[in-house]
């Protein structure tokens, strides 16, 4: 033993000093000490280079500690944690640095300081680069220049990032962006059920799975979640004058005449929640920020064994067209798996901590006004699917007796819990009956009182009974936020509710596959035969080219592919294809019942709603629910499974819109798209969660680089916009519409001459193939559709023109009204008459259209041809031919509002 000790020498490298309890160093072999010294020297050289290279790119500092400074000195076969933080009380990966005066959090908006942290030789560095990589990517001149820039910026406290970048340096930074798309892996994660903070901060073992908090023989936490600072996110944006101006959208929107009184609901600010906060003194400064939160979990691999949860923050102060773009979203937290989180409060702790500080106000510099102000931010809503909101709100979930978060309806158990308003006839005396138009709604005060009762329970058994009675498991950490109101701050997600649940269940009912195969309940006059469904699927497939490409994915055979349908395809099935395909095949009562649902969905999809629209939505969903409960449930116990919670939630949709604004503002399409973007980031099978977190952090850095205009423009020059002037056949200076090529001189036929005489006078001129509308749509023509194998029909149009209401009565004074017409564009014509050029469209009109009681428009044949002003074309539609009837498919539900 003595002999072995004598062969060892003292190593005082940073790693060994940290592993020694006294901080002196460790006794190791000479060869190991030599390797440590080389590694430490290499790390110091790389850090000197990279801290300068990337000093202008960070979005915010990383929470760190003295314990985290050894990561770059680990053995070469180990990966490095991009955002590792061993000493963090909550073991949360943050974009903030410890500062004593703010309890361990620091918000620095300096890009230079931030990227120094990111590239320093600490455990929060995000990737492991060897010396050869740096030498290959950065020439000595670039390295010297970066060092000079770093020194000059450090000496100048007023440095604003306005520096001159050489071509070599910009190439190096572009290369860094390319690297951000590569595989950045790190140490392995274990199952994550709780975050170690709050009541868990002193625990050494997880109380759910009993696994150790620390790595073997190291006082280092095994697991970390990623947290990205909301405060830094907002501060950085206000440093850019352009973005600071864009953040006034909320103030501009709410300053319109009649706001809050005109009954218009066009954004989340028209909802009752915002109006209530406004009346209570919130959002007094035009620069105060309104936020929206969203949570969702997804499977990172196809085998669906590894969960990952995302907390997304959306800035409602940005206009709707921009707030949904990737660069304007903030992924506030990544909760790694593989297990789903058991205590969601523990993971929300750092987010709520920052949101509370933002409620009280933080110092922020506004570059637009060149002044420091007190920035307040309040979160208006939290959205998510049912499992997500169940965790967030601390509810017992949709499988419990009190599964509805909006009302106190009690479910009925039959192998599962279901929610009819009328109990089965056999058990009318056992269960309560509810009025669908007057449900017992929950209130914020009721939530708080019930949580108090839970906490006063004398035993676990008593608490469990109260949880079942109330449908609440405990106190959500969201109660710490003043702006949150239970349950009105948690809107219904119509993407999952309508498109992925109800549409699918209705299809199963109509195909006779809803109940188990051994059940005798797969009967009813609403069921269509297999032969009818086969024809429906064939008609959908044959119509694939008859709809404009802007309608989305062409219809797929629903019989063959319904299991692979996504939300958008179910939405298209509901609003565009279902009524024409079911008309004449389904009994009239069922067709009319389903039409109420379809029309309600089409209404809530509108970008802007009126009070009358909301009343109509409430009435239509109520009517559909009554029809559904009567025809499909029939108050029979054996059919109780038809009354799933999703059908009950239809009764709360109108109230949800009134509270938090139109559905598009809060539905889950946005976070589902974010989860889809995160899927390819898990390139590492061994360390997928670190892989995802690393890449997201690099995303955030480049997203925030746009707010440092000079550097962003130098690194990523603006791309020259293509004006397609060569494709322009004709345009007018006072018009937003233009004619697109190809074009040619055209001699009008006799029949065309006759038609144009009716409009103006005879002549010939340039004929165009496409019309670019003011909405940016390119409406084609029959002349343009040359390749019939793949070209889609995008020349069927809706035309709105003024007509004389009394044209059949010449003696009456003309009274012009707007009227809709449908037709197909043969071609466009730039027509010159009396030195004035007109843009005309040669239209093949449909015959008279008919509208049935469900609002479905159809016609039997086409009619005459006519020249019209191209400006009268509003948008394109689809003509869905079924047998001898053409049905008008119109996806643009908002054309009347423009």
Tell where the protein language model's regions lie, with residue ranges.
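Terminal interaction-prone segments of large eukaryotic proteins
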Residues: 406-409, 434, 438, 442-447, ...
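Domain-level detector for long, ordered catalytic/regulatory cores in large eukaryotic signaling
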Residues: 113-125, 134-136, 202-203, 211-270, ...
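Polybasic, low-complexity terminal segments and linkers that are predominantly intrinsically disordered
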Residues: 1-157
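Compact, glycine/acidic-enriched structural inserts
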Residues: 316-364, 703
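Cys/His/Pro-rich metal-binding microdomains
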Residues: 12-14, 207-208, 405
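Acidic, metal-ligating active-site segments
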Residues: 264-337, 409, 580-582, 602-603
